[in-house]
Amino acid sequence: MNKQIVVLGVLALLLVVTAAATASSTAREATPGVTKKQVVIGATFPFSGVASSYGVIAKAEAAYYKWVNAHGGVNGRKIKFVTLDDGYNPAKTVPLTKELVEQDHVFAIVGQLGTEPVLSVRQYLNSHKVPQVLVSTGASYWGTQYKKYPWTIGWQPNYVAEGAIYGQYIDAHQKSAKIGVLFQNDDYGKDYVRGFRAGLGKGKNKIVKSEGYSITEQSIAAHIALLKASGANTFFIAATPTFAIQAIVVASKLNWHPKIYLNSVSGTNDLMNIAAQSAGSQDAVKGIISTAYTLIPDDPHYAKTPGMKLYRKVMAAEKPGTRLNDAFNVYGMGQGWAFVNALKRAGKNPTRKSLMKALLHTNTRANPFLLPGMVTKTSASDHFPLNQARLDKFQGGHFVPFGKLLTYPNQ
């Protein structure tokens, strides 16, 4: 009888241990960041430093997720968006991203900002099969190197293609152009220049001077002075907002008034008006040409569109603490919409793999925050979600569209 009790006790203990081991195994196999009620995602953004104006993107994206949560969430789950400040410094991006993955156990890194910051953790995230998606940078890498880095995908039109648009336009419309180029001397700026030169084609000999700057420089006035001295009558700027504004202001102060082409990430109404105010004249920004692919908050052409109506509702309800007419708000919400759309299609019990599958099987015109008619399209062999844009010219305090929506080959 005593032996039976001992045997039964041992069997019971084995059952408990087995059950515990099974439960532990199941817990380990569960998708990180996903519970029955919540999906946790995260990203690093520059809330401080030279690129802090981009922090608006994260705040608006978070506001959109709050709006979605207030209206039922996604497949019964609320989205929690954890953002950390890396100051646009890759040395900070690495430990902060590891914190998001290893301590916060995020489901995915969504919207992470900056070419160099994103590159600094791409290998780490891909080796751990953590989705690094809809990154806030148009570097061509995200679309061209997908075989080596299958867990990374961008969102916005890529910089090479955008640069080509400006080059093609100048080659076609400014036969006597003498071009000075200012670019951020890293992968971000070099992508723009590569596309710009390709767009110029045989006209690339119109470039008379190129100047690269470092984000650690306090002033780029010396670069602008050299560009002016070159005799350039056309100025292509591939810079982040702080340096783009500085370039415009310094050119004005030096009494240099070339035809200016400005990359889209710095070409917003808010930033142009800040530049004009700093220069002391609207003439400093008059006629600047840039491109757009999202709705512009204070553009009367889109005031009555469903996207702009939704935008104002989200801003009023969630109060992200950003300026209503800051175009980076729309960027953030458009990005948020893209993630929510993919999460819905990733299934009732989403996995990291099913999220990537959804992102790579997209074909929609439904994103309300993009320009009317724009298509978001991907496939197993096409990892560039957006490849359309429209040329805009700054006049009367805001960018005015001209020409049609352009579709360009991804590069």
Model segments located where?
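Short, low-complexity disordered leader/linker segments with a strong preference
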Residues: 1-40, 410-411
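Beta-alpha junction/loop-to-helix N-cap segments that form part of ligand/metal-binding clefts
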Residues: 27-29, 38, 52-59, 71-145, ...
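Hydrophobic alpha-helical segments within soluble ligand-binding/sensing domains
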Residues: 93, 154-178, 218-221, 244, ...
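Extracytoplasmic "Venus flytrap"
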Residues: 28-37, 42-62, 84-91, 113-114, ...
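Segments of small-molecule ligand-sensing domains
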Residues: 317-329, 340-398
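Extracellular/periplasmic periplasmic-binding protein-like sensory domains
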Residues: 251-332, 405-409
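Immediate post-signal peptide segment of exported/extracytoplasmic ligand-binding proteins
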Residues: 24-42, 73-78, 171-177, 349
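Extracytoplasmic ligand/sensor domains, especially the bilobed periplasmic-binding protein
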Residues: 105-211, 261-290
